[in-house]
Every structure is written in structure tokens, then in C-alpha cells.
Amino acid sequence: MQTPQYLQQRRKFAAAFLAFIFILAAVDTAEAGKKEKPEKKVKKSDCGEWQWSVCVPTSGDCGLGTREGTRTGAECKQTMKTQRCKIPCNWKKQFGAECKYQFQAWGECDLNTALKTRTGSLKRALHNADCQKTVTISKPCGKLTKSKPQAESKKKKKEGKKQEKMLD
């Protein structure tokens, strides 16, 4: 005769075994249900690299614009496309709108030419633009800007005139 403890253990083992068999059957069915997809053939592109034109602003000489791209290839679906682009308005356009330079301080005034010069080194080029590594710019010497104290004295004069008009 078997003890009740032994029978209880046997029932638990049988239940665990049946659960294990059920899980195996479910996994096998799920794998059988999956269809084997034929591998896609990797098609090597006969197309060349995209070559992009410079960014042409929609209006003015900076801001939003477009650029044209072309590529070669006998079996290319697309050989031309247009892309939106942007030319920053704070860049010096005389060196190319897609080239950003880091400039040094202005040099001393050359008395022979009456010009100051400074040099800029290339900081960044947009869209693989063809930019010079260094550039030099010049400007006339001697034009002094108005200092802040003069501007403050003008404000005081205007305020004084306003008060005189109010008194009249």
C-alpha cells in the first residue's frame, strides 16, 4: 500500500510532465505555422553616387532654398531629385554661402593701402561644398563708431526737449 504523501507527489509529477509535453507541442506547432520566406536577392546598385549642386535660395541670398541632385547608371529608377536646403543668413557669402569660417581679430591699419585685414580658417562646409581652407578679407581703416556715452547724452537731450514741450 502507498502512502498519501507518495500519491500526492506522483500526481504533481504527472501534472508537471503533462504541462511540459503541452508546451513542447505548442512550440512545435508555432514553428510549423511559420512559412519560410525565400531570401531576397541582394541587388547591387548600378547607380553612381549622388552629385549635388549648390543650394539656391528661394528668395534673397540666404534662407530656405533647393538643390538639384543627379546620378548616373543604366538601371537607376531615379537619376535626378530636388532636395530642400538652407543657407545661414549670418555667413559671409563672398566666400561661398555653404562655407563657414572662423576669423581672427582685425590686424593693424596698413598706411599704404588704408585697409585692415584679417584671416579666416575653414570651420565647416555644408553638403561637401568646395571651400578654400583659408580666406582673407579687408576693410577701410579709421571709421570710428560712436561710443555709448554719446548715445546716452543724446537720450538726455531728447528727454529734456520732451519735458520742455510738456511745460509749454
UniProtKB/Swiss-Prot annotation:
Is Membrane set as a keyword in this record? Answer: no
Give the disulfide map: 47-76, 55-85, 62-89, 99-131, 109-141
Does the entry feature the keyword Signal, yes or no? yes
Alphabetized, the UniProt keywords read: Disulfide bond, Growth factor, Heparin-binding, Mitogen, Secreted, Signal
A Gene Ontology annotation in the biological process aspect, one of them, is: learning
Q: Molecular function terms in GO for this entry?
A: chondroitin sulfate binding; growth factor activity; heparin binding; protein phosphatase inhibitor activity
Modification note:
Phosphorylated by NEK6.
- Annotated spans, Chondroitin sulfate binding: 92-99, 123-131
- Known Gene3D superfamilies for this protein? Heparin-binding Growth Factor, Midkine, Chain A- C-terminal Domain (2.30.90.10), Pleiotrophin/Midkine, N-terminal domain (2.20.60.10)
Secretion signal: which residues?
A: 1-32
Q: Which family does it belong to?
A: Belongs to the pleiotrophin family.
Name this polypeptide is given: Pleiotrophin
